[in-house]
Amino acid sequence: SPVISFKNYSFQYRAQKRPTLTNINLDIYPGERVLIAGPSGCGKSTLAGCINGLNPCSNPGEATGELIIDGVDATKSSIFELSAHVGTVLQDPDGQFIGLTVGEDIAFSLENSCMPQDEMHQITRKVAELVKINNHLDYAPHELSGGQKQRVSLAGVMVDQVKILLFDEPLANLD
């Protein structure tokens, strides 16, 4: 069964007169990699925001139709509940940083779930190595290049082992 399923789904921001998304029908299955491409303003980020719960939880608007994310009805779920299923790397990673250091930022969700320190440090180091940021764990995020910041954001969602990874303009700052 699909891991993401849109059925006659529309979304309209409260501040707009017309829906940004209209009658979307789309099924994405486990293991598929899907690229949504189009010109600026066509609704790519809005679609992503509906998948990860930013729309309408953080960006007020009205949704109609059906959106199922990993078996969860997104139209009736909180952003917190959806974050257990969807990891998001934003175009501007500065908006995602929470910790004082790269290591703290990567480990943030693990610490929030009360994971034992030894296990948390081990997972953080392993994921940092995978994205080639392991030599910067003690740096502050603002000390990094744009591409390094993207790697930290990616590591921060990888530690959660979510089924769905969502990238909004992931190559914008990558070096």
Where would I find each of the regions flagged by the language model?
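A short, flexible loop at the N-terminus of ABC-type nucleotide-binding domains that lies
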Residues: V3-F6, F11-N23, N55-P60, K76-S78
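Catalytic Walker B motif of ABC-type/P-loop ATPase nucleotide-binding domains
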Residues: L165-D168
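Short helical segment in ABC ATPase nucleotide-binding domains corresponding to the A-loop/adjacent helical element
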Residues: N52, D94, L100-E111, H121
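Hydrophobic anchor residue at the start of the ABC signature
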Residues: L154
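Conserved ABC ATPase "signature" region
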Residues: D118-H136
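Conserved ABC ATPase signature
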Residues: A140-L144, Q148
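ABC ATPase NBD Q-loop/coupling interface
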Residues: E66-E81
